[in-house]
């Protein structure tokens, strides 16, 4: 190329059209490569000095413009503009963006939000829910490298470095924005994304406004099977589609993604393309107009011209193009401003839908010498040829380091240069080179080139708060975290570093995929000469290296190395000397030298030491022995310990019986912070502590805990062992580990810990966390967030979040626990030899002592002494002097308030009402006024105003309730309201109580005048008596005092017999209850013990306990005398004979009784009910012990599991096995199927959690275990689709194969789960290579296809290999053919050729000669008669599918031929005749004409070069058209399913001319008469049909006629709307609704409302939220608002839009709060969503808002809803309370009876009837109830029951008659 200008020939050209001229001028202005154009302004500036140069400049300019017209410039960043549509190829895929390769070596980026609107909406939903959505695919799952995508340039940004960045979008709404609905034509090739999944296909977003595009399942099957690995399309999936059919002027479009249709789609003139809507990626047939050295100029689609630059010519045909040559081309881009169309002739773009195969180049980054120039293009660049033949391209900007150094003469063809491969352009199939010396010399070109541990040089780019950004290469940036800026932590790094500084770093971590580079500037690490640890495998014991401390813990330091490898330095390895607190010695970020002690690469666990070990280091035998002993103790174990020594911080103890040393810190001695130091003080060496919890252990250290709350948690199994077991919302009990300024760290017994930030630490404002909590404090925490990836969780300690139930109950439990511990301390004190200590141990509050005044102090307090014990100090505060004047030596009577066991002092009082307290009997649960006398940290001592008794009550209502403002704190002398929990002082000397509301506290001390006290006491008694009278109406009428004790025998009469208990009336009017478990000693299984007792029978029973009337809770009795209302009785023969001592176990609490049960124990329980919501059986083991039987533990029968309540009767005795005793909640988890834990060989019921395609099932069990079922264990006979019968939540019967791992191995084979079955095992289990024998025929599933073989799974862990030569006799040449025929999961039959156990290799054969099966590439032959029995159903399904496929194929063909008359019928008949003749002619040869040859014909069809049939008579063009496939190619389809490809409309005229023998014949007179008569008959038939009133409308005209005749009928209008909706004509349906609203008369309010509701439904289903809101607002204006609100709420609920429904109900409750219908509907809505607690609050709110007259109706409605949707027991309670207040509301009784009949037992129904017929009602109403009772017994009872009702009715009539006579 001696003269570069020769490349641009000059000369005359044809005249251009105006449009072409304007186009050329714009190109001319956009020319950014022309050097002369850039120099134009400079020349003009010079020309001002000399006018002689002006003429010369103009001549040069004209020549330049003329030459530019012939130039073919390549794309550059400067030539791109926003809105430009361009074809690209996916280069890289990350989680948040795509990197897309563009033509001419450019690239752009697609953000995750630019895929499509539906995908963006899903992403927003996922962000809002804060958890991943199952149906949302990640970006790498939607796109893969090599995919061709149509893009639009969304923006051209400038990066921080000043370079342009191209932002792209593949959103169809932006790419196809230029298309309109009316521009759509069949055959168009478009791209779109899946927007939703429908029943029969997918809705595809093609971005055309007003168009709904639908892709049927039939058209998607081939794509799903071959390219989607059998998985259904998901939202956001990118598709290249062909428009098959256009309806409603583009409103509805049918699409196809079949490969044959997509690959053959060309843009045609009939599709009406123009320059405005021409899209990249379209294939066109073009004609070469002009050939130049730089490319071609083409004509296509008649009117359009385009350019092909030198990069996109077909390499093999380079130089062979000529004018007028016809070529296939692909449109690359259309410039929106210049209208220049760029095309490509490369073969890779001529097959739409096919991804690019080569997406990278292996030699990226390589430096090459002597690379020859192939060609040079001015202003574009140079083409080089590499040694492997690959072409490479270097832009002009990469040919030299600067413009000045560039010399075009140096790049003549044949010249060689040194260069470096910097990238590979997929779109151009070219390697991209650079000749810049700076790039060639750069050590790193990509992140892949950087090795971990390498020392690199870089330049500081910026200083950020989190670290320093360093530039390492041209496109490589790294981060130096703040911790790694220096060997020490730097506070002001900007003082040492500034942008532009050169630094030397060492690489810590490099992730090329994420483009993440982390480096360090720590001098010790950068200059270290020691070996580096970059992986766990390289960490050998004894290796010494440098690392960085990243965390300092109590148990040691965590040291981090390179590549995120880290290890632990235990506390004992930190130094040769003991370091009690590592945080005071070490700090985060410290560089240390360590030695590796041990490493487990599989567990990624490494132990290190700061004590740089040598082989000669002596070992401590004591340490080894202690380590052996610690191994015997496990975390969570309860042990007994003996105190060895007391330290300042705790107790050194020995764990019995091995005397293993351990440590028990002082805060862990008690849940109460004040009791810990007391226990520490009084525990002595040699004392033994029981039930101590092992909290944590290391090699030298075991930490113990004695906190009762933590011990109970571990015992109850409520302590999660790993973070994966923890879910947000869980309540956990732990202790405060440490307190920081930003929050509190809480640790749990298993060792897990979490952070409670200040914001959620307390309901009060937190300034300093240490004011609210102390280290070691027991707390209850609620999990708010779990991050498993970072092994972190956030906790809330707020009381509002961590409620444990009733605050009064919790407060009382904490008080009992605290006083119990104080009593234990008294026992420790009593063991001392000191008389003073023993005296203090014997003193209890309330004792009255004679004391002598010893001293009166300045503050007014008095110190007393006692004669018997001289050292005893008694102290009375100024308040407790009670205003008395005292002098030393004076004798006084004092009362003990509290004994300080630490200071050895006694707090006393001189108040006379305390010293002389009244002996007045107190009642339990009675409320009293009290005065605070003494305050301790966790409880207070008060005196009752009426009597002077001392009472203790807790100051905290929760473990977290430890902080109170000064205004909230109690003071001595303050008045409080107390509710008594005990009535007699126990061993503590105090009566126990709980405090009432804080609002009832009084500031000043109440009066203590005796008269006032007496008056108030009398008033209090009167108030309590009145309250008791009110409670009698709601409870039992026999609430009387009695003097019975446990063990007493009583005699009574049975009042009523229930299913699970019997009610007994005792002689004195008391009521007792006999539970079903207290009737017989041995209860036969299946019987109901209560049936042995009859109403009216007298029984003798033993008192065993009592039951609270209000709460119905069992009350254990801990002392012999008690006063209760309902007594618990027993009539067991053994207990009636026994003595009182034999019954002392009944005094235990339910929690203690639960502890006595062990897993595996067999118990007898009594069925109570089946909880439908919770899916478990509720049973009673005893009166105070409940049980639950999960549904899956009920039976191994699927029939029973479907209706478990039908198997058992209420009260029936059942024998069950204890699975797990739930101690805190006092119930047992039971099982009816035998095993109480999952063991190998057991059969259990499970529930499918997840179905994994081509893998198997994940199954969950009620034992908390998870198991997996392999594909090979689903059945004894494999099938083609083994997983289609399984779905999540399905119940399956499983056999436990193995429990060796955390995830169980399961089997669903009938031979395993049901040993009694005798079904033949068609596919035996293959568990190892030993189970396989040579010559054996086996079936298996295809796992994958390799380049030379196929891998087949024979068992869960057994694979076989079939070489291509043993797969098929056809031997197709490409791997893709195997992928298509043998997809993953396909069932195949194989013969075992060889078994090599040494190599663990099984060779298989799929050849028909070995297996007897058809070839995998041939259609399946008709099975023999004996083979049909096993697959009859599958064969029938296949036939139905084929028949359906043929019918669907014939439908459009019939529609195309519909109007062609007799000629078409004759053609179809002749064609059918020919098709029918062929099998007769060929006979048996038809079976041979299958498989390979049909397969190769299909392949030839794809290429587009049809060939003659291989054998048989060749058909002429006038004969039957060639057969084609109806829906993709199916290997199992025979020739009978192939249909002829009938000619289209365009071909019909040609075929008609070519077939003269099929022309129309002239009709005779007789034939014309017959046709006329036939037409008249048809016309009369149509008229009769139109007059038929029962005729169904079939068209819009039919509906128009109907609505004209009945304009006010909303039914017709709704049918009209439905007619349009079925045709997806949404706008027409809206128009019909609007017509209806205008047409229907205003008097027909209901008819109009029906249309409004239909319109709301339409907008909810097909419209937007905005359109729905507009319709709703209009409907409210024209109708009764309440009705419209209720209808919309129903619409939201039915469409499962619960959030919108809830918001609407809240609006209704504000606007219509006086309407009971709104409250009832809202209650039904809440209960329907299983929110029982919310429904209770709704009822309370309703009663507050509605008038009193509506209350009963609303309460009854809510009770009905509870029966239907909620808890039956709660519904009964509501009815009972209502009827106790309104006993004569017969309507309520009637509803109660109806509900009980539907949802209750027969016993319950009869009980209600018995109660109602004994009411004193009017005779008319009594007659109604007697009639209902009689009808019920006739239907459900026996003849005896019917007679009994009649007798009762007769008794009632006689009683009434006698009353009238009197």
Swiss-Prot record:
One of its GO terms (molecular function) is nucleic acid binding. It is found in: Nucleus, Nucleolus. One of its GO terms (cellular component) is cytosol. The modification Phosphoserine is found at residues 7, 438, 1468, 1490. Signal peptide: none annotated. Residues 1006-1019, 1423-1437, 1445-1454, 1566-1577 have a biased composition (Basic and acidic residues). Residues 43-56 have a biased composition (Basic residues). The modification N-acetylalanine is found at residue 2. Its main location: nucleus. Ubiquitous. It comes from the Eukaryota. Keywords: Acetylation, Isopeptide bond, Nucleus, Phosphoprotein, Repeat, rRNA processing, Ubl conjugation. Pfam families: S1, S1_RRP5, Suf. There is a cross-link at residue 1424 (Glycyl lysine isopeptide (Lys-Gly) (interchain with G-Cter in SUMO2)). Residues 1020-1033 have a biased composition (Acidic residues). Residues 83-171, 187-258, 281-346, 365-436, 453-522, 542-611, 636-707, 729-798, 846-911, 1047-1120, 1160-1233, 1241-1309, 1335-1407 form the S1 motif domain. Residues 1-56, 999-1036, 1406-1520, 1545-1577 are annotated as: Disordered. Interacts with NF-kappa-B p50/NFKB1 and NF-kappa-B p65/RELA. This is Protein RRP5 homolog. It comes from Mus musculus (Mouse).
């Amino acid at each position: 190329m001696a003269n570069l200008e020769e490349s641009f020939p000059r000369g005359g050209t044809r005249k251009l059209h105006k449009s072409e001229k304007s186009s050329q001028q714009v190109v001319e202005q956009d020319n950014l490569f022309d050097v002369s154009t850039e120099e134009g302004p400079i020349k003009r500036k010079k020309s001002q000095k000399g006018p002689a140069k002006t003429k010369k400049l103009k001549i040069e300019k004209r020549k330049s413009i003329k030459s530019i017209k012939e130039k073919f410039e390549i794309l550059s960043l400067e030539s791109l503009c926003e809105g430009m549509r361009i074809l690209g190829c996916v280069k890289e895929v990350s989680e948040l963006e795509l990197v897309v390769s563009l033509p001419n070596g450019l690239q752009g980026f697609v953000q995750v939000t630019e895929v499509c609107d539906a995908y963006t909406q899903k992403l927003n939903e996922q962000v809002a829910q804060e958890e991943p959505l199952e149906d949302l695919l990640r970006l790498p799952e939607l796109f893969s490298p090599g995919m061709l995508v149509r893009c639009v340039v969304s923006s051209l940004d400038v990066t921080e470095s000043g370079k342009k960045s191209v932002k792209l979008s593949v959103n169809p709404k932006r790419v196809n924005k230029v298309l309109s609905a009316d521009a759509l034509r069949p055959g168009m090739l478009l791209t779109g994304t899946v927007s939703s999944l429908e029943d029969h296909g997918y809705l595809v977003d093609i971005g055309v406004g007003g168009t709904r595009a639908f892709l049927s399942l039939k058209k998607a099957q081939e794509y799903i099977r071959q390219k989607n690995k059998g998985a259904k399309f998901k939202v956001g999936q990118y598709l290249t589609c062909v428009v098959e059919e256009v309806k409603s002027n583009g409103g509805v479009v049918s699409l196809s993604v079949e490969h044959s249709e997509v690959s053959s789609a060309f843009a045609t003139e009939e599709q009406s393309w123009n320059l405005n809507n021409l899209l990249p990626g379209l294939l066109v047939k073009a004609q070469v107009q002009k050939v130049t050295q730089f490319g071609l100029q083409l004509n296509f689609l008649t009117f359009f011209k385009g350019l092909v630059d030198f990069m996109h010519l077909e390499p093999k045909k380079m130089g062979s193009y000529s004018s007028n040559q016809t070529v296939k081309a692909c449109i690359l881009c259309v410039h929106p401003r210049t209208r220049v169309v760029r095309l490509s002739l490369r073969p890779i773009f001529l097959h739409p839908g096919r991804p690019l195969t080569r997406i990278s180049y292996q030699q990226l980054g390589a430096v090459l010498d002597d690379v020859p120039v192939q060609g040079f293009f001015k202003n574009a660049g140079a083409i080089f040829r590499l040694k492997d033949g690959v072409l490479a391209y270097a832009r002009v900007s990469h040919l030299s380091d600067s413009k000045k150094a560039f010399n075009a003469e140096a790049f003549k063809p044949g010249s060689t240069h040194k260069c470096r491969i910097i990238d590979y352009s997929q779109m151009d199939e070219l390697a991209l080179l650079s000749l810049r010396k700076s790039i060639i010399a750069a050590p790193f070109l990509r992140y892949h080139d950087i090795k971990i541990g390498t020392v690199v040089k870089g330049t500081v780019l910026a200083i950020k708060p989190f670290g320093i950004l360093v530039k390492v290469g041209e496109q490589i940036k790294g981060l130096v975290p703040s911790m790694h800026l220096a060997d020490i932590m730097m506070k002001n790094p900007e003082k040492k570093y500034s942008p532009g500084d050169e630094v030397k770093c060492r690489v810590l971590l490099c992730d090329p995929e994420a483009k993440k580079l982390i480096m360090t500037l720590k001098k010790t690490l950068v200059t270290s000469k020691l070996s580096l640890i970059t992986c766990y495998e390289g960490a050998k014991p004894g290796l010494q290296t440098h690392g960085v401390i990243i965390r300092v813990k109590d148990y040691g330091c965590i040291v981090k190395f390179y590549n995120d490898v880290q290890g632990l330095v235990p506390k004992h390895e930190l130094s040769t000397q003991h370091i009690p607190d590592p945080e005071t010695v070490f700090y985060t970020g410290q560089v240390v030298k360590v030695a590796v002690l041990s490493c487990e690469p599989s567990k990624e666990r490494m132990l290190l030491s700061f004590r740089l070990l040598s082989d000669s280091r002596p070992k401590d035998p004591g340490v080894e022995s202690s380590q052996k002993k610690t191994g015997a103790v496990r975390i969570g174990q309860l042990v007994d310990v003996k105190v060895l020594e007391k330290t300042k911080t705790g107790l050194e103890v020995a764990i019995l019986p091995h005397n293993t040393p351990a440590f028990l810190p002082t805060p862990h001695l008690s849940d109460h912070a004040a009791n810990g130091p007391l226990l520490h003080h009084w525990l002595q060496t040699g004392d033994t502590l029981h039930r101590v919890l092992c909290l944590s252990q290391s090699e030298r250290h075991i930490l113990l805990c004695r906190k009762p709350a933590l011990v109970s948690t571990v015992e109850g199994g409520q302590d999660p062992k790993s973070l994966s077991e923890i879910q947000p919302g869980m309540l956990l009990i732990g202790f405060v580990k440490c307190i920081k300024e930003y929050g509190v760290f809480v640790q749990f017994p298993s060792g897990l810990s979490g952070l409670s930030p200040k914001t959620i630490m307390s309901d009060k404002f937190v300034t300093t966390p240490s004011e609210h909590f102390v280290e070691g404090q027991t707390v209850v925490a609620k999990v708010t967030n779990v991050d498993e990836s970072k092994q972190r969780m956030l906790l809330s300690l707020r009381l509002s979040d961590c409620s444990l139930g009733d605050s009064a109950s919790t407060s009382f439990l904490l008080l009992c626990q605290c006083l119990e511990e104080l009593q234990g301390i008294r026992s420790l004190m009593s063991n001392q030899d000191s008389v003073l200590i023993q005296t203090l141990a014997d003193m209890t509050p309330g004792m009255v002592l004679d004391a002598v005044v010893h001293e009166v102090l300045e503050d007014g307090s008095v110190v007393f002494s006692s004669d018997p014990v001289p050292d005893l100090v008694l102290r009375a505060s100024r308040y407790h002097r009670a205003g008395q004047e005292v002098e030393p030596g004076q004798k006084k009577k004092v009362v003990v308030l509290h004994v300080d066991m630490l200071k050895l002092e006694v707090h006393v009082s001189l108040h006379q009402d305390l010293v002389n307290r009244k002996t007045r009997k107190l009642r339990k649960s009675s409320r009293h006024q009290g005065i605070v006398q003494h305050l301790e940290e966790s409880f207070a001592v008060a005196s009752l105003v009426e009597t002077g008794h001392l009472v203790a009550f807790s100051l905290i209502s929760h473990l977290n309730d430890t902080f109170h403002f000064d205004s909230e704190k109690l003071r001595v002398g303050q008045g409080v309201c107390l509710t008594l929990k005990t009535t007699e002082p126990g061993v503590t000397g105090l009566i126990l109580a709980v405090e009432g509301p804080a609002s009832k506290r009084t500031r000043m001390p109440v009066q203590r005048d005796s008269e006032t006290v007496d008056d108030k006491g009398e008033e209090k008694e009167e108030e309590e008596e009145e309250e008791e009278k009110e409670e009698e109406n709601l409870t039992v009428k026999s609430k009387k005092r009695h003097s019975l004790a446990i063990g007493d025998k009583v005699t009574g009469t049975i009042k009523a017999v229930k299913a699970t208990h019997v009610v007994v009336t005792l002689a004195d009017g008391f009521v007792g209850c006999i539970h079903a478990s207290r009737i017989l000693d041995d209860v036969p299984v299946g019987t109901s013990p209560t049936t042995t007792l009859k109403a009216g029978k007298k029984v003798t029973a033993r008192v065993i306990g009592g039951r609270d009337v209000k709460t119905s809770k069992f009350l254990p009795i801990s002392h012999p005398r008690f006063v209760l209302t309902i007594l618990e009785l027993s009539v067991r023969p053994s207990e009636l004979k026994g003595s009182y001592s034999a019954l002392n176990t009944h005094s235990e609490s339910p929690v203690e009784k639960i502890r006595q049960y062990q897993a595996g124990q067999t118990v007898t329980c009594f069925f109570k009910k089946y909880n439908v919501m919770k899916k478990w059986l509720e049973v009673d083991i005893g009166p105070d012990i409940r049980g639950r039987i999960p549904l899956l533990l009920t039976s191994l029968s699927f029939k029973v599991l479907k209706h478990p309540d039908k198997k058992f009767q209420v009260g029936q005795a059942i024998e069950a096995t204890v699975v797990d005793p739930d101690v805190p909640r006092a119930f047992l988890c039971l099982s009816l199927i035998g095993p109480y834990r999952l063991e190998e060989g057991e059969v259990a019921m499970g529930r499918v959690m997840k179905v994994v395609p081509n893998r198997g099932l994940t199954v969950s069990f009620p034992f908390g275990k998870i198991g997996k079922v392999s594909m090979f264990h689903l059945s004894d006979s494999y099938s083609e689709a083994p997983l289609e019968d399984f779905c999540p939540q399905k119940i399956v019967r499983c056999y436990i194969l193995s429990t060796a791992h955390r995830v169980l191995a399961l089997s669903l084979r009938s031979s395993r789960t049901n040993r009694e079955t005798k079904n033949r095992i068609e596919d035996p289990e293959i568990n190892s290579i030993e189970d396989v024998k040579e010559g054996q025929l086996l079936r298996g599933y295809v796992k994958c296809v390799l380049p030379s073989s196929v891998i087949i799974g024979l068992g869960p862990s057994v694979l076989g290999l079939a070489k291509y030569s043993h797969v098929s006799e056809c031997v197709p040449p490409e791997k893709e053919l195997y992928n298509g025929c043998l997809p993953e999961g396909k069932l195949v039959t194989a013969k075992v050729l060889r078994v090599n156990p040494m190599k663990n290799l099984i060779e298989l054969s799929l050849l028909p000669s070995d297996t007897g099966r058809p070839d995998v590439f041939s259609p399946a032959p008709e099975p023999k008669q004996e083979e049909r029995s096993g697959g009859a159903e599958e064969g029938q399904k296949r036939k139905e599918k084929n028949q359906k496929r043929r019918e669907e194929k014939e439908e459009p063909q019939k529609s195309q031929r519909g109007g062609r008359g007799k000629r078409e019928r004759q053609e179809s008949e002749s064609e059918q005749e020919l098709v029918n003749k062929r099998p007769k002619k060929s006979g048996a040869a038809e079976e041979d004409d299958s498989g390979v040859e049909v397969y190769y014909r299909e392949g030839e069809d794809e290429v587009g070069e049809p060939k003659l049939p291989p054998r048989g008579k060749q058909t002429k063009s006038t004969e039957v058209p060639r057969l084609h496939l109806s829906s993709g190619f199916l290997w199992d389809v025979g020739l009978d399913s192939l249909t002829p490809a009938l000619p289209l409309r365009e071909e019909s005229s040609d075929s008609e001319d070519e077939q003269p023998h099929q022309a129309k014949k002239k009709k005779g007179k007789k034939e014309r008469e017959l046709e006329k008569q036939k037409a008249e008959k048809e016309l009369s038939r149509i008229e009769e049909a139109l007059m038929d009133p029962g005729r169904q409308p079939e068209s819009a005209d039919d509906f128009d006629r109907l609505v004209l005749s009945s304009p006010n009928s909303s039914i017709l209008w709704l049918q009209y709307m439905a007619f349009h909706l079925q045709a997806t004509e949404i706008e027409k349906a809206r128009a019909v609704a609007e017509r209806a609203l205008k047409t229907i008369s205003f008097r027909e309010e209901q008819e109009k409302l029906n249309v409004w509701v239909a319109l709301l439904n339409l907008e909810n289903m097909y419209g937007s939220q905005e359109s729905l809101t507009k319709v709703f607002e209009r409907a409210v204006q024209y109708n009764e608002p309440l009705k419209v609100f209720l209808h919309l709420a129903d619409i939201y609920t039915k469409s499962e839009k619960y959030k919108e429904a809830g918001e609407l109900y809240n609006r209704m409750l504000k606007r219509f709060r006086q309407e009971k219908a709104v409250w009832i509907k809202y209650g039904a809505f809440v209960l329907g969503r299983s929110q029982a607690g919310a429904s209770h609050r709704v009822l309370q709110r309703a009663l507050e808002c509605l008038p009193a007259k509506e209350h009963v109706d609303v309460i009854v409605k809510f009770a009905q809803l509870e029966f239907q949707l909620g808890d039956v027991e709660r519904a009964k309670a509501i009815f009972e309370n209502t009827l106790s207040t309104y006993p004569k509301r017969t309507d309520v009784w009637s509803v109660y009876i109806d509900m009980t009949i539907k949802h209750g037992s027969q016993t319950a129904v009869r009980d209600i009837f018995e109660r109602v017929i004994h009411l004193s009602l009017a005779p008319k109403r009594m007659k109604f109830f007697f009639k209902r009772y009689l009808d019920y017994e006739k239907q459900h009872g026996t003849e005896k029951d019917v007679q009994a009702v009649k007798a009762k009715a007769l008794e009632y009539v006689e009683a009434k008659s006698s009353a009238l006579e009197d």
